[in-house]
């Protein structure tokens, strides 16, 4: 696993987030991250707003004084999004919305 400091730019839905990832040496890249082990309702489905709002609150509690979260990742999923873990957020969301099949999207 690789660990990075990142700023959350946009919460796409309850399991997808856009980050500006700090690579060091004043180098930052923007990536779309998919929370590992979590599968929240998609936009337009029941509980979509609830899942998205819960993620928003969890991210707010994970931010450090500079506004960064710590994310870990090793690979991209089948749709090109980085599969990420952000503090304890994945574990908390997976209790309500676990990813039910092998692998991850």
Residue ranges of each PLM-predicted region?
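Small beta-barrel nucleic-acid-binding modules, primarily SNase/OB-fold domains
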Residues: 1-105
């Amino acid at each position: 696993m690789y660990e990075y400091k990142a700023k959350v730019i946009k919460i796409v839905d309850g399991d997808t987030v856009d980050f500006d990832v700090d690579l060091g040496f004043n180098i930052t890249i923007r990536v779309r991250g998919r929370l590992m082990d979590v599968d929240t309702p998609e936009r337009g489905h029941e509980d979509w707003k609830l899942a998205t709002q819960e993620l928003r609150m969890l991210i707010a509690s994970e931010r450090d004084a500079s506004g960064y979260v710590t994310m870990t990742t090793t690979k991209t999923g089948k749709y090109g999004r980085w599969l990420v873990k952000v503090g304890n957020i994945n574990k908390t969301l997976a209790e309500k919305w676990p990813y039910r099949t092998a692998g991850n999207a």
